[in-house]
Structures are given as C-alpha cells and as structure tokens.
Design a protein with these regions (language model features):
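N-terminal basic/disordered segments at the start of proteins
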Residues: 1-56
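Extended hydrophobic packing segments that form well-structured cores
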Residues: 12, 392-510
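Short hydrophobic segments within beta-strands
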Residues: 15-19, 124, 172-174
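Short beta-strand elements in bilobed, periplasmic/extracellular small-molecule ligand-binding domains
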Residues: 51-76, 202-208
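Short Gly/Thr/Asp-enriched flexible loops that form oxyanion-binding sites at enzyme active sites
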Residues: 107-118, 295-310, 462
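Conserved, well-structured core segments that form the ligand-binding/active-site neighborhood
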Residues: 129-342
C-alpha cells in the first residue's frame, strides 16, 4: 500500500488530573471562601473545566490530529496516589503519540509521576501556569512541550505530525550504482542513509533500475530479462488501455500540449510502474537517479523520462525527487506534512551581475532576454527551474491549477514534462528548505515570485525567478546545504524551524 503523508494522523490523548477537597477548612492551600470551600464544589468546577476544555480542544485541533478518548481523574486532599490512576492513563499507550495534559494545583505528585512513567511526548495545555507544570518535567528529562496559547499548540501539533510522518515513511530508491549517493546528480545529498534512519526514523526500500525498466512491458511466461521466472509488478495491457484515457484527460485540461500521445503514454507507464513498486513495498515517496539511468540508453530506447512521474506523485502528496536527491525527498515529506501543499524541487541558483544585463551566462539557454527585461529590480534575485511543476501549488486538496505539457528530449520529443505559468503567482510568498547532507542543520529561506521562466521551452527548464531578502547571505548558507531547495507556497519557516530543532539540528533562517 502506498502510505501518503497526509493520511497520517497524530493521536492525541487529553489527560485531566484535577483535585478536590473532601472537607471544609481554610489555610494556605485554600485561595477562596464561602460556598467554594464546601465539599463537592471542586467537583462541580472540575466538571465544567473538563467539558469546556474538551470543547475547545475539539475546536482548535488541526485536521491532522485525532483526539482520543480523554482521561479525567480527581484525587483528593488525602494525597492519595493509586496505581489505578496510571492504569487508566496508559491503557491505550501504544496508540498514543502525544499526551495533552492538564494538572490542578494539589495534584502535583500524581501529575509528576505520570510524567515519570510516560514514554511519549507530553504537551501542557496552555495557560499562564504552564512553566510551573513543565519545569519539573524538563528538569527530569521528560519530552515536554509547553506553548503559551492554543494556536501555538496547534501549530506544534502539525510539526509533531510531520515527525511522525517522516518516522513512519519508507522511500523507494531506484538504484543503478550506489545506495547512498548517485554517480551523477545530487552528490550533495545525505552522506549516509543509515544515519538518516537512526536520526529521523525514515526507512529505504531499494529496487534496481534495470528491473524497473523491464517492468514497462507486460510480463511474459519467461519473466523479465533481469528477473527470469519471477513474478514482478509489470504493467498490464489493461493498465496501458487506462493510461491512454489518462493521457486524453491530461491533454484536454492542458492550456498547451507539445508532445505526441504515444510519448505521453510512455511516461505514464513509467509513473504507473513506479507506483506499483511503491505499493508493493509500502512506500511514501520515491527517489530516482535520472543521469545514472540515462547513461544506460534505456530511456532513449523506451522513449520516456521520469519527470511526469514526479509531478503526478507530488500532486498526490507523495515526495518524488529526481537526481537521486534523498535529502530533497525527506525535506518534501516535511513540507507536505506541514503545509498540505505539493512541493516543487529544482536547481536553485543566484542571479549574479556577471554581464551588463545581470544575467548568469550559464542560465542564458533557459531564461530568455525578454523574460529578464520584465524584471526591473535586479537585486537579490534567485531562479529555480526543473521539469517537475504540477497542478497543486495551492494545496493538494485544492482544485487543479493551470498547466501545459511539453517534451524533454529536444530531437526525438519524448519524455512528458509539465509546465506552469508562474506569472499567475507573481507576489506569492514561498518557503524553501533543505536538510543538510551531514544532518547537522536545515536551511530555511523565504522568497517572493517575480517572473515565470521556461514555460514555452522543452527539456528541464520550467520555473521562476524569485526575490530573497539577502542573496549573498542565502548563497553563503546554501553552499553548506545543497543545490536543490524544495519549496512550497506560503510561509512555513517557523514550523520547519521547530521541526529541525526537534531533531537537534541547527535551523538556519535566511
């Protein structure tokens, strides 16, 4: 089964450890008078607090949270501590991700012992007394989170869901030569994937690239060339017929089409085979080494690329990275979980003043002079481009955006690629991020879309120019992080910062 990030829920169990006085008396532990001192009054107040708070919890929790059955207990001024209290709290602990706890003055011993026994994250329900509750937890090594307001807490819940989604993810690695890094492409990615698993929990499932390409044709009785006699998830004749219809639908919705249908179907077959392998290995994303596979000449023979596969995966909330960029794929996991939007990954490069027009010479093949003439202020510009735009920049569950379909190969015109006119999004704020290859930091940046580029071009050229606050600062940080900076529409810098710091990484904001 394909495990989609947005299907992951954070299981949150509210715990109310209240307190009730059994007798009438006054003194330094009673801060009221009149009827409030009478036995039974505390229980009335505690019940009202419980009902009102639960109503607030159900209202304020983000969609990614599953609120579990709450626990309510009311120890007394006998200072009673009973095992049954903890049995009740922890009866469904294996399913719990986070305990959302509230403790009344007087119930401190039970509240603190609950924390000592707990093996999961505890979030303190927001109120001004939070530090009094959280201080003991923190000082004794409990994984505790204390936020001042409910919106702050809800945002932190989103970050915790992202951690869970990453921890439970399996990423399909289509390999040719190496496991950790490609021969060509994203050699600035994670240096050691075992370290990634140890730190973040995500696991990896490998499939040989030649086996994948063999599966682009229906399985024969003899099996595939690379796996003779074995049953493999090859494309079927029925699936090819369905993909013919998918091609027609994609053509009908596109603003512009510049690829023949048979070439389009070839790329859809590649996508279908990747998804069948992801389904087989319970994966949440995939990474493919396009240069490493390209040199086999099998893409040239079969007339396809994996570009459309990445676009269609991303639209479904499935991280999908080219150039075997595992760091980008894991970053995408985080961005999807936090934003609910489909990321876009591309070459992320500064536009330096290297000639009178301020155009990087190495970008002239992609960014036309006409496009640059539309950019009046040349300060602090970056450009991002690749062949994997899509229709879900505004949200995975939002209506499709506009798009065009072109081809990758200039001469033979194979390899379907999507295009999006980012001029429709001028002024849109974006968040870019990337985990560093040594797992020591996460670079997080903001920008604003200025001008679309490459919309009318083929090959690996679709993207946009954007403006950052300080180009030099961004570049000086980027060289420690890597080329591809997966991005999403909107400002999610604080959530990504919280996520990085939760892993003990340095969060670099530029």
């Amino acid at each position: 089964m394909i495990k989609k990030v947005l299907d992951i829920k954070l299981n949150v169990k509210p715990v109310f450890i209240m307190f009730a006085h059994k007798y009438y008396f006054e003194g330094p532990c009673r801060m009221t008078g009149g009827e409030a001192l009478q036995p039974g009054f505390d229980s009335i107040v505690n019940g009202a607090i419980f009902n009102g708070t639960m109503e607030g919890i159900n209202f304020s929790m983000p969609d990614c949270v599953n609120v579990m059955e709450p626990v309510f207990m009311e120890p007394t001024c006998d200072w009673d501590i009973k095992d049954e209290y903890f049995d009740k709290i922890f009866e469904d602990e294996p399913e719990v991700d986070v305990y959302l706890a509230s403790g009344a003055f007087g119930a401190d011993q039970i509240y603190n012992e609950f924390a000592q026994r707990c093996k999961k994250t505890i979030m303190i329900m927001p109120d001004i007394w939070g530090p009094a509750r959280a201080g003991y937890f923190y000082n004794t090594g409990v994984d505790v989170i204390c936020e001042p307001t409910w919106p702050d807490l809800a945002r932190h819940m989103v970050v915790l869901r992202a951690r869970k989604a990453i921890r439970e993810a399996n990423i399909l690695l289509v390999t040719r030569f190496n496991y950790d890094l490609p021969v060509a492409g994203a050699t600035d990615s994670f240096v050691n994937l075992k370290d990634v698993t140890n730190k973040m929990g995500v696991h990896f499932r490998t499939v040989n690239a030649h086996e994948i390409v063999d599966q682009f044709h229906p399985l024969t009785e003899e099996g595939n060339h690379t796996t003779p006699g074995r049953v493999t998830p090859n494309i079927t004749e029925e699936e090819i017929a369905e993909l013919e219809k998918v091609a027609d639908e994609l053509f009908a919705g596109a603003q512009d089409v510049e690829i023949e249908k048979d070439m389009m179907v070839n790329s859809l077959i590649a996508h279908k085979v990747i998804q069948k392998n992801m389904d087989l290995y319970d994966c949440s994303g995939c990474v493919i080494p396009c240069p490493d596979i390209c040199s086999t000449r099998r893409m040239n023979k079969e007339k396809f690329t994996f570009c459309l596969n990445h676009s269609l995966n991303l639209e479904q909330g499935i991280p999908s990275a080219c150039e075997y960029d595992v760091a980008a794929a894991v970053t995408m996991l985080a961005e999807i979980a936090i934003s609910g939007k489909a990321p876009y990954m591309g070459n992320t490069l500064p536009i330096m003043a290297t000639d009178p027009r301020g155009v990087n010479l190495q970008l002239l093949h992609m960014v036309s002079e006409e496009e640059y003439e539309k950019v009046k202020d040349m300060d602090n510009l970056y450009v991002v481009y690749h062949s994997t735009p899509h229709r879900k920049f505004k949200g995975i569950n939002e209506p499709d955006g506009s798009y065009a379909i072109r081809h990758f190969a200039y001469d033979q015109k194979f390899g379907a690629v999507m295009r999006h006119d980012f001029n429709e999004d001028k002024g849109q704020e974006i968040t870019l991020a990337r985990f560093s290859g040594d797992l020591k930091r996460m670079m997080i940046a903001k920008g604003t879309i200025v001008q679309s580029v490459g919309y009318d071009q083929n090959n690996c050229n679709g993207g946009f120019i954007f403006r950052v606050e300080d180009q030099q600062k961004m570049y000086r940080e980027q060289w420690r992080s890597g080329l591809h900076m997966p991005l999403v529409f909107g400002d999610y810098t604080q959530e990504l910062k919280m996520l990085a710091e939760s892993y003990g990484m340095e969060a670099i904001l530029v």
